[in-house]
């Protein structure tokens, strides 16, 4: 890795979106992590018939395809499709030859060991990368916010985690996983809008609801008070124009949708809300570092983009924590991509260059080298 001008490729594979690029300040390519296969092979006349479509192309042809997400709850469940996504990332999106670059990948906290090895194997054996490294998403988010100690709440499309990090290392015994994230909020909003008499069922309509969720929803500081206000007047109502020109009006759904993050019982889940998960994570850590964790709670991922979420987290945690504790919740404006940005920062550090797993090391030790070098 002595060559200074070889650019590292940074790939953050999320359950919903794949973010990829070089050592810049923002990802070059962001596309849906989906693979589509023709429902009825042979009838797509005139189209260059492929056996699979990836990302935006799969999205645009979804009427005639069966769409699958190879990453469920942050963990890769279908390796053939995952390989297709990586192939698409390198050759179609970034237009690079992976054998000429080192590649930095991200993984969920508590990723199964076998998965980590499989990832490493595919990178070296299928794509012949120069070198590679795997890092935990939450740790990268923390780097992007400019610190190495803190508690990260990372919530994406498929899964949420609360991860305590001390001096750059995640503390695995205290990590909490919550299978509640963006996809569930979209599902819930679809259901809630049905109560208003609007019908959203197909995958295409689901994308519309996701857009409504991203543009119009917010987290209420006081949910009951907000419900009362919404019931008494129409000041909280907003209208949204559908692609067919119809306009729908949404009122209390605007804050009922993300409230599920704090009260999962709204959708029949028995788990704790994100504030409670964060509190439990901190309480599982050594008493001496709790002050540092409370003082730097960092939000990351697309599902933390709701306006008002930072203030609400501060309020909820202040109620749970000891009264003398100073609590600071950080919600960086670029948090949608902070995992990727952290990866980009890490890959361009001169001190990081000796950390890569090289092709030679892989050939000598096999896939298990990843546990020794990436922890």
UniProtKB/Swiss-Prot annotation:
Keywords: ATP-binding, Cytoplasm, Cytoskeleton, Hydrolase, Nucleotide-binding. GO terms for cellular component: cytoplasm; cytoskeleton. It catalyses: ATP + H2O = ADP + phosphate + H(+). The keyword Nucleotide-binding applies. It is found in: Cytoplasm, Cytoskeleton. InterPro entries: Actin, Actin_CS, ATPase_NBD. Pfam families: Actin. It comes from the Eukaryota. Gene3D superfamilies: 3.30.420.40, Actin, Chain A, domain 4. Its EC number is 3.6.4.-. One of its GO terms (molecular function) is hydrolase activity. Actins are highly conserved proteins that are involved in various types of cell motility and are ubiquitously expressed in all eukaryotic cells. Belongs to the actin family. This is Actin. It comes from Fucus distichus.
